[in-house]
């Protein structure tokens, strides 16, 4: 909790972007969809270079503002086409982005869109830990890239 209290403070483990000091975080890209494209590129590189029988996964954490960006959607189309089964994106769907409520600017049904792009789609209660664990397990056994749409309430 102390790390979250230091959000966006110099030297914290929860910095602003683009800093990579937090262990396990290879890229902290902020909004505008660059993180989605970067994560898809990392998953492609891992899949192409892996000599191991162990399946490794690339995880993307994205919000409403990220998926509204064309760069994220273009990269997502490629991930579906390439069947990047080692890619799991958690989409925190709280219906809020930097300019306010998403309904003012975006009515996209991302579950339908990602399904059409060849992704394994799951919609869950993003506050329910059991649903999160089960959705991750299901995603790890899919032969497609996975998007877990966690419906959340901001700051809950």
Residues of each region from the PLM?
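A short alpha/beta connector and helix-capping loop motif
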Residues: 69-94, 132, 147-150
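Cofactor-binding active-site loop characterized by glycine-rich and histidine/acidic residues
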Residues: 1-82
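Acidic, glycine-rich active-site loops and adjacent beta-strand->loop/helix elements
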Residues: 11-13, 59-69, 92-97, 127-129, ...
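Short acidic, glycine/serine/threonine-rich loops at helix termini
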Residues: 18-19, 70-74, 98-104, 133-136
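Glycine/aspartate-rich loop-and-adjacent alpha/beta segment that forms the canonical ThDP
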Residues: 112-115, 120, 129-156
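Hydrophobic alpha-helical scaffolding
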Residues: 31, 65-66, 100-104, 122-129
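Short coil/turn segments at beta-strand junctions that form active-site/ligand-binding loops
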Residues: 56-57, 85, 143-145
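Phosphate/pyrophosphate-binding betaalpha-module
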Residues: 81-91, 95-112, 117
């Amino acid at each position: 909790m102390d790390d979250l209290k230091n959000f966006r403070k110099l030297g914290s483990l929860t910095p602003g972007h683009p800093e990579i000091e937090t262990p396990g975080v290879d890229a902290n890209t902020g909004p505008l969809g660059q993180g989605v494209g970067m994560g898809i590129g990392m998953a492609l590189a891992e899949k192409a270079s892996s000599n191991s029988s162990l399946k490794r996964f690339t995880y993307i954490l994205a919000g409403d503002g990220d998926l509204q960006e064309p760069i994220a959607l273009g990269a997502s189309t490629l991930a579906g086409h390439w069947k990047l089964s080692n890619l799991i994106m958690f989409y925190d769907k709280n219906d809020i982005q930097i300019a306010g409520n998403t309904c003012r600017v975006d009515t996209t049904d991302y579950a339908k869109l990602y399904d059409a792009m060849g992704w394994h789609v799951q919609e869950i209660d993003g506050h329910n830990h059991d649903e999160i664990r089960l959705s991750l397990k299901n995603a790890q056994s899919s032969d497609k890239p996975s998007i877990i749409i966690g419906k959340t309430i901001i700051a809950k």
